[in-house]
């Protein structure tokens, strides 16, 4: 916070020492973080007195913005100091001072997730590039603009600015500053589906920064390694990398928002580990049920892994709670939205569909506030998955039609939102979600679902066998089932029945039709029997054969 004394003297007379400004610039360029932070604390009175009538104050404010980005103070400090430089009085500033003020304004906009506004500030700075001798600030402007574009999911656009920022840093003989920019370059390579190239780029930056105390950037490197490991299905390695990132971030600030991001990443990995474990438990349970049909006296064993599954879920929720506390401090909409989305998938996995639906809607509203296409797209994908689950489970009477329709609407909106970005993987996920939603009712959606599959495959190249790939396989499996049904009906319409008797054909037809009518009739056996004029006993038998009713259920 700006001290009360400084507030009384916003026009503090005197001059900001050029040596002090040069030291701040050099400490940033050489990533001497602790030294720079200490220097600012020693000169706190000078910082707090920063005002329009103080020579060099605007340049100081520009450097302060860079140090706030590193962790010196909250962006609110820059916002308060900017109020001392009203637009109508800036005509007396030099071009360099004006550029630094624009950088400070861009930093504030960036911290408030107003990325379009921030981009405009940085574009003004870059438009004056030829008139500015201080190329370090031009390098930072390119870098920050690239960061904004990356947050918007415009990876290809971002890469050009990041490359220019790094090139300028190298020309200025600032290899450590260039390495910081290289980390973002590696992250973009990862998002573009180049994990090996990303790891190589990150490794080069890691080597340069290893002897510095730039713990935030070092943490970002570990975090990026964690995401690469997660994408490749190496969940234990991913947890280790995220743990290392948390350790690095904690050396600088226990409430760093990057720290919150790592907590969310760990929670999501533990969710994926939980899904793996649950699938293993389900396989063991199915194997035992099959064995028990041959030995009626065998009691059902206590399956191993249930306690571990419970523990993984509890730990995931604990990590999300920590992340949410940090994001609340910054009012970070994207961060809070990602927390809610991860909550949503944990609720969905556990069958708590009402809570999953609620947090999905909350995440979407956060994205709507900031016009965040990525967050809105992710939220709609979650909401689509919830409606698909409602349809499959038929938890509300007469809900099948509305759930399938809502699922398709959410998925189509997701596709629309994410197509405003260059996030190929997220676009693929949206197409998979739409394909799965269309599979809920095959009356007119088979070809559209097949097109969704083709689109997803195109955007997922090169393929990696992670959870998104498994979702794609699930979509393909459902489409194969639809193809089998359609081909069977087509053959029957042409009189091709092979050696099947009419009774056998009737039974197979009933097995196709009855489950669909049962869903449309709110999962009520009596309604199906009345509508089709058949025995309720036959309806129950067919539903049980397909695993839609247990032995104790009557529908």
Residue spans for each PLM region:
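Bacterial C-terminal helix-turn-helix
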Residues: 495-555
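Structural motif corresponding to the intra-repeat A-B loop/turn of tetratricopeptide repeats
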Residues: 72, 112, 132, 152, ...
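Short coil/linker segments at helix-helix boundaries
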Residues: 275-315, 392-406
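Residue register of alpha-helical TPR repeats
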Residues: 58-59, 100, 140, 180, ...
């Amino acid at each position: 916070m700006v001290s009360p004394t400084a507030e009384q003297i916003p026009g503090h007379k005197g001059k900001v020492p050029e040596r002090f400004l040069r030291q701040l610039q050099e400490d940033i360029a050489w990533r001497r973080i602790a030294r720079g932070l200490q220097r600012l604390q020693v000169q706190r009175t000078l910082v707090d007195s920063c005002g329009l009538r103080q020579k060099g104050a605007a340049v100081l404010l520009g450097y302060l913005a860079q140090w706030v980005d590193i962790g010196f103070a909250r962006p609110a400090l820059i916002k308060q100091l900017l109020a001392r430089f009203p637009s109508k009085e800036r005509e007396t500033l030099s071009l360099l001072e004006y550029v630094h003020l624009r950088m400070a304004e861009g930093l504030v906009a960036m911290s408030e997730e107003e990325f379009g506004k921030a981009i405009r500030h940085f574009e003004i700075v870059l438009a004056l590039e030829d008139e500015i001798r201080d190329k370090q600030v031009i390098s930072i402007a390119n870098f920050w603009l690239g960061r904004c574009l990356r947050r918007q999911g415009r990876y290809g656009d971002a890469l050009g600015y990041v490359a220019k920022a790094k090139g300028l840093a190298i020309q200025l003989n600032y290899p450590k500053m260039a390495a910081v920019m290289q980390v973002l370059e590696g992250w973009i390579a990862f998002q573009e589906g180049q994990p090996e190239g990303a790891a190589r780029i990150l490794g080069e930056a890691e080597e340069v920064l290893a002897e510095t105390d730039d713990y935030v950037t070092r943490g970002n490197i570990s975090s990026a390694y964690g995401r690469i490991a997660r994408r490749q299905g190496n969940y234990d390695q991913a947890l280790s990398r995220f743990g290392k990132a948390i350790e690095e971030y904690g050396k600088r600030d226990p409430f760093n928002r990057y720290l919150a991001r790592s907590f969310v990443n760990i929670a999501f990995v533990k969710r994926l580990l939980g899904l793996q474990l649950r699938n293993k438990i389900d396989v063991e349970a199915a194997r035992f049920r099959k064995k028990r049909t041959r030995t009626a006296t065998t009691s059902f064993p206590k399956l191993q892994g249930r306690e571990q599954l419970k523990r993984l879920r509890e730990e995931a929720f604990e990590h999300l709670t920590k992340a949410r506390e940090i994001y609340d401090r910054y009012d970070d909409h994207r961060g809070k939205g990602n927390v809610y989305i991860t909550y949503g998938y944990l609720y969905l996995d556990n069958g708590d569909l009402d809570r999953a639906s609620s947090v999905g809607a909350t995440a979407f509203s956060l994205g709507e506030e900031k016009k965040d296409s990525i967050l809105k797209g992710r939220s709609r994908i979650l909401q689509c998955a919830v409606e698909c689950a409602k349809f499959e489970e038929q938890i509300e009477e007469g809900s099948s039609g509305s759930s399938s329709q809502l699922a398709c609407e959410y998925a189509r909106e997701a596709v629309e939102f994410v197509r405003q970005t260059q996030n190929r993987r997220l676009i693929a996920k949206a197409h998979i979600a739409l394909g799965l939603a269309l599979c809920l009712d095959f009356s007119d959606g088979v070809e559209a679902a097949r097109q969704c599959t083709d689109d997803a495959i195109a955007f997922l190249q090169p393929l990696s066998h992670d959870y998104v790939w498994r979702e794609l396989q699930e979509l393909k499996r459902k489409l194969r089932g639809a193809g089998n049904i359609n081909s069977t009906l087509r053959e029957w319409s042409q009189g091709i029945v092979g050696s099947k008797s009419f009774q056998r054909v009737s039974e197979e037809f009933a097995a196709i039709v009855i489950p669909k009518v049962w869903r449309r009739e709110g999962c009520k056996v009596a309604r199906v029997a009345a509508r089709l004029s058949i025995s309720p006993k036959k309806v129950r038998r067919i539903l049980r054969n397909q695993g839609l009713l247990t032995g104790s259920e009557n529908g």
